[in-house]
Amino acid sequence: MSAAQISIEQSTIAAKAADEKLGTNIAVLDVSQVMGITDIFVVVSANNERQVAAIVDEVEAELTEAGLEPKRREGNREFRWVLLDYGDFVVHVQREQEREFYGLDRLYADCPVIAVEGIEPYQRPEEFTEVRGVEDLEDLPLAGEIPEDDD
C-alpha cells in the first residue's frame, strides 16, 4: 500500500508553500509502509528560527486556503522544529542543525520520495543504515551534533 493520492496532493501544497519561503532540501516521503498513523512526511530545512516561523506561516496559510487545518502543532514557541500534523500527512520544518541532529532523513531513508514539480529534487543522505533491518541497537545511526542556539 502506498500513500493515498489526496495525501500526495495536499502534501504537495505544503512543499510548494515551504519552497516559496526558501525552505531547502524539501523531502516529501511516503512513510505509509512504515507508519500506521500517517501517509507522508514533508521535511523542510530552514537557516534560523525566523525562517522556520515564516515557512510554517506560509504552509498553514496555503493549507487553510485549501480547506485544511492542522490537528496538532508542536514546537511553535522556539521555532527550531515545528511539526504540523494534518492527519494523513505531517509537515516537519526544522533548522538545519535540528534536521542533522534528529536525523529523520536517516530514519526514513528507505521510504519512497515523492517528486514535486517545480521544487529542486530532495538529496538523500549519502550514507544511511537500513534501520528496519538492524538486529542490534549499536548498529543504529547516531544522532548528529547537538544543535546550538541562534545568536
Task: Give the residues covered by each predicted segment.
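Glycine/charge-rich, flexible interdomain linkers and switch-proximal surface loops
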Residues: 25-37, 71-88
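Compact, glycine-rich, soluble single-domain proteins
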Residues: 51-68, 83
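Short hydrophobic/aromatic beta-strand micro-patches
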Residues: 43-45, 94
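Intrinsically disordered, low-complexity charged/polar segments
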Residues: 122-151
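N-terminal first-folded block
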Residues: 8-39, 47
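N-terminal presequence-like segments and adjacent domain-start helices
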Residues: 1-7
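A contiguous, mid-protein "functional segment" used to position or interact
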Residues: 86-121
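Signal for well-folded cores of large energy- and translation-related assemblies
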Residues: 19, 23, 27, 60, ...
